[in-house]
Amino acid sequence: MSKSIVAVVGRPNVGKSTLFNALAGDRISIVKDTPGVTRDRIYADITWLDKQFTLVDTGGIEPESKDMMLTYMREQAEIAIATADVIMFVVDVRQGLLDADNKVADMLRRSGKPVILVVNKVDNFDKFMPDVYEFYNLGIGDPVPVSAASMLGFGDLLDLVVGHFPPEALEEEEDERPRIAIVGKPNVGKSSIINKLLGENRVIVSDVAGTTRDAIDTAVTWNKKDYVFIDTAGLRRKSKIKEELERFSIIRTVSAVERADVVVVVIDANEGVTEQDAKIAGIAHERGKGIIIAVNKWDAIEKDDKTIYKYTNRIREILSFLPYAEIMFLSAKTGQRVTKLFDSIEVVIQNRNLRISTGVLNEIMMEATALQQPPSDKGKRLRLYYITQVAVKPPTFVIFVNDKELMHYSYTRYIENKIREAFGFSGTSLKFFIRERKEND
């Protein structure tokens, strides 16, 4: 099952960022050494009572005037409603109940989504509890007093959050059909690609009922194989603020990627790979998804016999953390190579499910260590005892060594490259865990 998504909504200066950062702590979902991965703390993966969820901060841009305030908050509420399973609505006990709070509460109430009313800045419960009671007037349940700055009340808050998640026994049965998310920054042609795919005569299309988000998922059959395409549109109305639009685009991407097996990252051929493209690709990479880079609007590019080669090299250079990603060039406008996307998706799915026997893996590892000696430090040399595959989707391996401190990242990458040379694994990341064991174990 994918992790539930919890969105944080509220006016500027009510302490959303403080609450988000305090809850996220060091568990923020960011790979610091990965180029192009977002570092603006929009989302974090959190575990509480053995339940994992993704916390999303919908804030970030402060309105320039009071007139913009309600529009800004409505957009926050819309993105939360479109993507979240549970919504944290944060208000400020010291400012009291404002008209904007009432209007957003109305939107959240009508959505039918679980809403937790978080009354922040309650540093002294005895002093502020009478003021907390005022927020009952919002009509969205019991207010939960917390102090983000002092981390007071977090246990009760998180208990309520995970209490809204469905019990495991009641969760949807695992759908065996591969789930495909087509993501990308605004205006790269995501909808055009989906519409072109779904408009093909050979494609059988139906809506998927009972999904956990408002977005409509679409069941697709192609060449007698079933897929589910995730609708990443979410917030249909565009924001007037560029930075806000980008932030909401990333939030929608997190929501879609969480549920996907394969992520198609759409890039505009006219623009090349932008910083936001890299951020979006990084989200999929962090979460170990299958990845296809689809360069759209290829019909608009003047070409010679080296154009694809140059474009591919440039993409590999900028997205250096995705050497395994499939790359394809297409045009939603003309339909050029659009249905070839199914072929790439199928390749990635097969590679994500590929299992390699322990015997074969150890032969590869022994050959690799013979070609390039493992590193050493202060006279102690790394010894690799054996390797085994423990999971798929993505393929996951455990390497047993004498001292995991000696297993540098570069040598793990070397072993990964040797495995890829033998089996390809195109389109999927590989995960490696290093474990120590004594020589006589």
Swiss-Prot record:
<protein>
    <recommendedName>
        <fullName>GTPase Der</fullName>
    </recommendedName>
</protein>
<dbReference type="Pfam" id="PF01926">
    <property type="entry name" value="MMR_HSR1"/>
</dbReference>
<keyword id="KW-0690">Ribosome biogenesis</keyword>
<dbReference type="InterPro" id="IPR027417">
    <property type="entry name" value="P-loop_NTPase"/>
</dbReference>
<dbReference type="InterPro" id="IPR005225">
    <property type="entry name" value="Small_GTP-bd"/>
</dbReference>
<dbReference type="InterPro" id="IPR032859">
    <property type="entry name" value="KH_dom-like"/>
</dbReference>
<dbReference type="InterPro" id="IPR015946">
    <property type="entry name" value="KH_dom-like_a/b"/>
</dbReference>
<feature type="binding site">
    <location>
        <begin position="10"/>
        <end position="17"/>
    </location>
    <ligand>
        <name>GTP 1</name>
    </ligand>
</feature>
<feature type="domain" description="EngA-type G 1">
    <location>
        <begin position="4"/>
        <end position="169"/>
    </location>
</feature>
<dbReference type="InterPro" id="IPR031166">
    <property type="entry name" value="G_ENGA"/>
</dbReference>
<keyword id="KW-0677">Repeat</keyword>
<feature type="binding site">
    <location>
        <begin position="231"/>
        <end position="235"/>
    </location>
    <ligand>
        <name>GTP 2</name>
    </ligand>
</feature>
<dbReference type="GO" id="GO:0042254">
    <property type="term" value="P:ribosome biogenesis"/>
</dbReference>
<feature type="binding site">
    <location>
        <begin position="296"/>
        <end position="299"/>
    </location>
    <ligand>
        <name>GTP 2</name>
    </ligand>
</feature>
<dbReference type="InterPro" id="IPR016484">
    <property type="entry name" value="GTPase_Der"/>
</dbReference>
<dbReference type="GO" id="GO:0005525">
    <property type="term" value="F:GTP binding"/>
</dbReference>
<dbReference type="InterPro" id="IPR003593">
    <property type="entry name" value="AAA+_ATPase"/>
</dbReference>
<comment type="function">
    <text>GTPase that plays an essential role in the late steps of ribosome biogenesis.</text>
</comment>
<dbReference type="InterPro" id="IPR006073">
    <property type="entry name" value="GTP-bd"/>
</dbReference>
<feature type="binding site">
    <location>
        <begin position="120"/>
        <end position="123"/>
    </location>
    <ligand>
        <name>GTP 1</name>
    </ligand>
</feature>
<feature type="binding site">
    <location>
        <begin position="57"/>
        <end position="61"/>
    </location>
    <ligand>
        <name>GTP 1</name>
    </ligand>
</feature>
<comment type="similarity">
    <text>Belongs to the TRAFAC class TrmE-Era-EngA-EngB-Septin-like GTPase superfamily. EngA (Der) GTPase family.</text>
</comment>
<comment type="subunit">
    <text>Associates with the 50S ribosomal subunit.</text>
</comment>
<dbReference type="GO" id="GO:0043022">
    <property type="term" value="F:ribosome binding"/>
</dbReference>
<feature type="domain" description="EngA-type G 2">
    <location>
        <begin position="178"/>
        <end position="353"/>
    </location>
</feature>
<dbReference type="Pfam" id="PF14714">
    <property type="entry name" value="KH_dom-like"/>
</dbReference>
<feature type="binding site">
    <location>
        <begin position="184"/>
        <end position="191"/>
    </location>
    <ligand>
        <name>GTP 2</name>
    </ligand>
</feature>
<dbReference type="GO" id="GO:0016887">
    <property type="term" value="F:ATP hydrolysis activity"/>
</dbReference>
<keyword id="KW-0547">Nucleotide-binding</keyword>
<feature type="domain" description="KH-like">
    <location>
        <begin position="354"/>
        <end position="438"/>
    </location>
</feature>
<keyword id="KW-0342">GTP-binding</keyword>
